[in-house]
Curated annotation (Swiss-Prot):
It catalyses: adenosine(37) in tRNA + dimethylallyl diphosphate = N(6)-dimethylallyladenosine(37) in tRNA + diphosphate. Catalyzes the transfer of a dimethylallyl group onto the adenine at position 37 in tRNAs that read codons beginning with uridine, leading to the formation of N6-(dimethylallyl)adenosine (i(6)A). It comes from Buchnera aphidicola subsp. Acyrthosiphon pisum (strain Tuc7). Disulfide bonds: none annotated. The lineage of its organism: Bacteria, Pseudomonadati, Pseudomonadota, Gammaproteobacteria, Enterobacterales. GO terms for biological process: tRNA modification. This is tRNA dimethylallyltransferase. The gene is miaA. The record marks 93, 115 as: Interaction with substrate tRNA.
C-alpha cells in the first residue's frame, strides 16, 4: 500500500527475487484495457516477467463494483495458495483493501432510474457530498467529494434501503480467513511527494497520454460519467478534448487531482490498523530488505 508515485509496483516486483509470490493488482484504474500511460501501468516487459492478476480485466465501457473485486480477489488468493505460493497484493485503491479486509454488507442492487437521477445531480457542485454528509457523515468522511461513483452508491443504498451504509456495515460478520502482513510505503514529506507527482504527470504526457485518451474519445461509446473516464488524468484530458479547458488547465488540474488523491490515501493509512509503515527509498532492494526484516521478526517462512 501507499500513496501514488511511491514505488509500490517496483517494490512488489523486487520482492519476487526473495519470495515465492504471485502479484495481484489492487487498483481501480489498472483494471481497464487500453488505459496504460495515464494509470502508470507496469511496462509490457515487467508484466511479461511479473504477471499481475486483476489487471486489464475490463473494457473502459464496463463498470466494476467493489463486490466484484471482493469475489475476484478472494478467488485469486485461493488459486495462488493452492499453487503453493504467496499472494502479494499491490496497489493504491484503499477502498478495495478495506473491502477485502472487512467485507461488504448485503446491499440493495443498483436502481437505474435512481442512479440516473443522482448522476444528473452530480453536475451540481458538491451536491452529492453535502447530501451524504447529512445522511451518513461517517461514510462522507471516508469518501472524496469528487469520487462520484462511491458517493452515488452510498446515497443509492440509503434511498433504497432506508439505512445508511455505515448502519449496514455494522451488521457485517465477514472475516478474512488468512494470516496477513500489511505494508505501506510512506513518503519522506509532502514537498517530495508533490514533486514526484508533477514529474510523473510530465512523463505521462511525454509518453503520449493525449494520444491514448484521443483513441478512447474517438470510440464513440465512452463518456465522461463512466468510472473509467472519471479516473484522474483521463477526466481532465477528456475535458480538454471537448474544448472545455486549455492544455495548461488540463495539466494543472491533473496535478491538483493527483495530489488530492495522494492526500486521501495517506489519510486512510494514518488510521489503518496493523500496518508496517516503511519510509520511502529510491532503491527497491532496500525497501524489500525492510519488508523481509519484518517478516523474519514475525517468524514468517516461505
Amino acid at each position: 500500500m501507499g500513496p501514488t508515485a511511491c514505488g509500490k509496483s517496483q517494490l512488489a516486483i523486487c520482492l519476487r527475487k526473495y519470495l515465492s509470490i504471485e502479484l495481484i493488482s489492487v487498483d481501480s484504474a489498472l483494471i481497464y484495457r487500453g488505459m496504460d500511460i495515464g494509470t502508470d501501468k507496469p511496462s509490457f516487459s515487467d508484466l511479461y516477467n511479473h504477471p499481475h492478476r486483476l489487471l486489464n480485466i475490463k473494457d473502459p465501457v464496463e463498470n466494476y463494483s467493489a463486490a466484484e473485486f471482493q469475489k475476484d480477489v478472494l478467488r485469486e488468493i485461493d488459486e495462488i495458495i493452492k499453487l503453493g505460493k504467496i499472494p502479494c497484493l499491490v496497489g493504491g485503491s484503499m477502498f478495495y483493501y478495506n473491502v477485502l479486509l472487512h467485507g461488504l454488507s448485503i446491499l440493495p442492487p443498483s436502481n437505474i432510474k435512481l442512479r440516473e437521477y443522482l448522476i444528473q445531480k452530480s453536475y451540481e457542485k458538491n451536491y452529492l457530498y453535502k447530501k451524504l454528509k447529512l445522511i451518513d457523515p461517517i461514510s462522507a468522511s471516508r469518501i472524496h467529494k469528487n469520487d462520484f461513483q462511491r458517493l452515488i452508491r452510498a446515497l443509492e443504498i440509503f434511498y433504497l434501503s432506508g439505512k445508511s451504509l455505515t448502519e449496514l456495515k455494522k451488521k457485517n460478520n465477514y472475516k478474512l480467513p488468512y494470516n496477513i502482513f500489511q505494508f505501506a510505503i510512506i513518503p519522506p514529506n509532502k514537498e517530495w511527494l508533490n514533486n514526484k507527482i508533477e514529474l510523473r504527470i510530465k512523463k505521462m504526457l511525454m509518453l503520449g497520454f493525449q494520444k491514448e485518451v484521443e483513441i478512447l474519445f474517438l470510440r464513440g461509446d465512452l463518456h465522461k460519467n463512466l468510472p473509467s473516464i472519471r479516473c484522474i488524468g483521463y477526466r481532465q484530458m477528456w475535458e480538454y478534448l471537448e474544448y472545455k479547458n486549455s492544455y495548461k488547465d488540463m495539466f494543472n488540474k491533473t496535478i491538483h487531482a493527483t495530489r488530492k488523491l495522494a492526500k486521501h490515501q495517506l489519510t486512510w493509512l494514518k488510521n489503518w490498523k496493523n500496518i508496517n509503515k516503511i519510509e520511502y527509498h529510491s532503491t527497491s532492494t532496500i525497501l524489500a530488505k525492510k519488508v523481509l526484516d519484518v517478516l523474519e521478526k514475525n517468524d514468517f517462512s516461505v
